[in-house]
Every structure is written in structure tokens, then in C-alpha cells.
A protein has these predicted regions:
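Short, structured patches in soluble enzyme cores that scaffold and shape functional sites
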Residues: 42-44, 75, 85-88, 120, ...
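Active-site-proximal, Lys/Arg-enriched surface segment
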Residues: 1-72
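Short, conserved catalytic/metal-binding motifs centered on acidic residues
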Residues: 1-4, 34-45, 79, 113-123, ...
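Short, surface-exposed basic-aromatic patches at helix termini and helix-loop junctions that form
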Residues: 109, 128-137
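An anionic, glycine-rich sequence signature occurring as long contiguous blocks
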Residues: 137-195
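Short acidic, glycine/serine/threonine-rich loops at helix termini
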Residues: 48-54, 82-86, 125-131, 149-155
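Electropositive, glycine- and tryptophan-enriched low-complexity nucleic-acid-binding patches
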Residues: 60-111
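Flexible loop/turn segments at secondary-structure boundaries
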Residues: 45-47, 91, 122-126, 146-150, ...
């Protein structure tokens, strides 16, 4: 027991990052698959007891409990975790998201990323600018602010995909953006398409 403990204590966070970074690079270089779809998200992991890095933060299922708030990246085509950063529970969704994105893409060096999908926690100018600079296609859920609501309620050209589900598009420029971007809007009738 103590021998294992002494051995494992030699691994610092920096050593873990270096070892597992190289391991991930090797693993993805060996995959004979290209044109990945990368999904990015964050989640809340409730903790029991006093685990290192756990802190009180946003926790919808068990408010007030200690938790971690990790960032995750998945290669959805083959259902593999591409990158995982464990963060304290009191970390906001957008903390270090750009560094996480850059680090994830560096581990997939030599592979083509055909599409990046992200939740609204990643909807920020820096992320959009970075993805566009890299020439990556992306779908990011946007935050539902008043200007988006206005566009949604005043849009008249909707395409019905199926009963109770319609899409439309508009051009939107948030404060601080140098240019407008295309926004695809989705609306669904809850009675016809419940969750």
C-alpha cells in the first residue's frame, strides 16, 4: 500500500498533463478515421465528502453541495473523450474555455475537424473569432438575450421541418463584435413536441 502511494505521489499535475497529452496525441494519430465532429460541454459533478478541488457553485440538482465543474470534449463520431479538464465547482462555464479549445485541437494535430459543436457556455466572441480564424465549421447554441428574442418573435419566414418544429435564420451582431454572424433559430410547439 505505501509503495503504491509513494509511487503515485511522484505524479504532479504537470507530469500528468505531459504524459497524458502525449498519450492522447499517439492514440488519435493511430485512429484511421478523419473528419471529426467535436462536441464541447461542461457538466456538474456532485461530490460527497471533501474531495480535492470540490467547491460550492452552480449545482441545479443539489444546491449547496460541493461539486466539480469539468470541461469535456468528445469525438462524437467514435464516442471517445478527446479532452477533459477537472475544475472546481465554483468555476463559471466560460472560465478557460479558449485555452481548453486550443489544447483539445492541439491533441488532434494532423486530423481534420469537420464540425465543432458547443453549448451556450462557449458562446463568446473569442471562441467565434478563434474558430473562424482556424477555418472550422461550428454550431454553437447562443444565449437567449432580448435581441435574440426580438428576432425570433418578429421573424416571418419559417421553414417547417416536421409537425411542431420550424427553423429560420437571421443576421445578428452582438455588442463588441466586428461583424455580424448568421444565426439559425429553431422553434418548437411544446404540445406537439414535448421534451
Amino acid at each position: 500500500h505505501r509503495a503504491y502511494q509513494r509511487y503515485l505521489n511522484k505524479f504532479s499535475q504537470a507530469v500528468n498533463q505531459r504524459v497524458f497529452g502525449n498519450l492522447f496525441r499517439w492514440f488519435f494519430s493511430e485512429l484511421k478515421f478523419d473528419n471529426y465532429t467535436l462536441d464541447f460541454d461542461s457538466t456538474v459533478m456532485v461530490r460527497e465528502g471533501s474531495q480535492e478541488g470540490a467547491a460550492k457553485g452552480y449545482n441545479p440538482k443539489r444546491p449547496g453541495r460541493l461539486s466539480h465543474h469539468p470541461l469535456l470534449a468528445f469525438v462524437s463520431d467514435v464516442r471517445i473523450i478527446a479532452k477533459y479538464w477537472l475544475r472546481p465547482g465554483n468555476t463559471s462555464a466560460s472560465t478557460n474555455y479558449l485555452s481548453f479549445l486550443e489544447d483539445t485541437l492541439s491533441k488532434l494535430e494532423g486530423k481534420r475537424v469537420g464540425l465543432v459543436r458547443m453549448d451556450s457556455g462557449f458562446f463568446a466572441k473569442e471562441i467565434l473569432d478563434y474558430l473562424e480564424m482556424k477555418g472550422l465549421h461550428y454550431i454553437i447554441a447562443c444565449r437567449f438575450n432580448n435581441r435574440i428574442k426580438y428576432s425570433l418573435t418578429h421573424e416571418r419566414k419559417w421553414i417547417e421541418l416536421t409537425d411542431g418544429l420550424e427553423i429560420s435564420e437571421t443576421i445578428y451582431q452582438a455588442n463588441g463584435w466586428e461583424k455580424p454572424r448568421r444565426i439559425v433559430m429553431v422553434r418548437q410547439e411544446i404540445e406537439k413536441r414535448p421534451k
